[in-house]
C-alpha cells in the first residue's frame, strides 16, 4: 500500500474514532456520593449519571431512580 493510501486509512480511522458516540455505559461515573434515600413513591427518573443534568448523579434507592445533587466526603 502506498504512503498516500496509508495516510488516508489513518485519517479515516481517526475520524471514525472521533465521531463514534460514546455510550453512557462506557463513561466513568460522576464524582461524589448519593445523599440518603428520599421518602417518596417509586419513580424511574433516570437510567445512569449521564441522563442527569450538570453534576447531578442518577441515584438508585431500590424502586426509586432519580437525579440528585451529589454529596462529597473526605
Swiss-Prot record:
Give one GO biological process term. venom-mediated disruption of cell wall in another organism
Question: InterPro entries from the xrefs?
Answer: Elafin-like_sf, WAP_dom, WAP_four-disulfide_core
Q: What are the cysteine partners in each disulfide bond?
A: 34-59, 42-63, 46-58, 52-67
**UniProt tissue specificity:** Expressed by the venom gland.
Asked if the record carries the keyword Aminoacyl-tRNA synthetase, the reply is no
SUPFAM superfamilies, alphabetized:
Elafin-like (SSF57256)
Q: Does the keyword Signal apply?
A: yes
Give the residue range of the signal peptide: 1-24
Write down the superkingdom of origin.
Eukaryota
Query: One Pfam family name from the record?
Result: WAP
Q: Which UniProt keywords apply?
A: Antibiotic, Antimicrobial, Disulfide bond, Secreted, Signal
- GO molecular function of the protein, one example? serine-type endopeptidase inhibitor activity
Where's it found, cell-wise? Secreted
Location, primary (coarse class): secreted
Where would I find the WAP domain in this sequence? 27-71
Cellular component GO terms, alphabetical: extracellular region; extracellular space
**Biological function:** Damages membranes of susceptible bacteria. Has no hemolytic activity. Not toxic to mice. Does not inhibit the proteinases elastase and cathepsin G.
Task: Report the family membership.
Answer: Belongs to the venom waprin family.
Which PANTHER family does the record match to this protein?
ELAFIN (PTHR19441:SF30), WHEY ACDIC PROTEIN WAP (PTHR19441)
The name under which this protein is listed is Auswaprin-a
Q: Which organism is it from?
A: Pseudechis australis
> What taxonomic lineage is listed for the species of origin?
Eukaryota, Metazoa, Chordata, Craniata, Vertebrata
Amino acid at each position: 500500500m502506498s504512503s498516500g493510501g496509508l495516510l488516508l486509512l489513518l485519517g479515516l480511522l481517526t475520524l471514525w474514532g472521533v465521531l463514534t458516540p460514546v455510550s453512557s455505559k462506557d463513561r466513568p461515573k460522576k464524582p461524589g456520593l448519593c445523599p440518603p434515600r428520599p421518602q417518596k413513591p417509586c419513580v424511574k427518573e433516570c437510567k445512569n449519571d449521564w441522563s442527569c443534568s450538570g453534576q447531578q448523579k442518577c441515584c438508585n434507592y431500590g424502586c426509586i431512580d432519580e437525579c440528585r445533587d451529589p454529596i462529597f466526603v473526605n
